[in-house]
C-alpha cells in the first residue's frame, strides 16, 4: 500500500516536470524564437530542459535571435 502510494506521488511529480518542459518548448517555438548557438541558457530553454523564463534569458549577455 505504501509503495504504491509513493509510486503514484513520484509519477505525478514526473508528469508535472515533463509538462513544464513541454510548455517551455512550446512557448519558444510559438513565439518564433531560435536559440543563439553560443547561449546555454536560452539553448536549454528552447529545448525544454529547464523551466527557466524569458526574463532570465533576455538580460545580457543572454539574447534571443528571431527568424
From Swiss-Prot:
An annotated GO BP: killing of cells of another organism
GO cellular component: extracellular region
Keyword Secreted attached: yes
Compartments, as annotated in UniProt: Secreted
UniProt domain comment: The presence of a 'disulfide through disulfide knot' structurally defines this protein as a knottin.
Additional information: Negative results: does not influence host total hemocyte count. Does not influence hemocyte spread index in the host. Has no effect on humoral immune system, since it does not influence the activities of prophenoloxidase and phenoloxidase in the hemolymph of larval Diatraea saccharalis. Non-toxic to human cells, Gram-positive or -negative bacteria. In vivo, ingestion of this peptide does not impact larval mortality of the lepidopteran species S.frugiperda, a non- permissive host for C.flavipes.
Protein's recorded name: Teratocyte protein CftICK-II
Organism: Cotesia flavipes
Biological classification of the source: Eukaryota, Metazoa, Ecdysozoa, Arthropoda, Hexapoda
Amino acid at each position: 500500500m505504501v509503495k504504491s502510494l509513493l509510486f503514484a506521488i513520484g509519477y505525478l511529480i514526473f508528469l508535472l516536470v515533463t509538462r513544464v518542459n513541454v510548455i517551455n518548448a512550446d512557448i519558444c517555438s510559438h513565439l518564433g524564437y531560435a536559440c543563439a548557438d553560443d547561449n546555454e541558457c536560452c539553448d536549454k530553454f528552447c529545448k525544454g530542459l529547464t523551466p527557466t523564463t524569458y526574463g532570465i534569458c533576455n538580460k545580457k549577455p543572454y539574447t534571443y535571435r528571431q527568424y
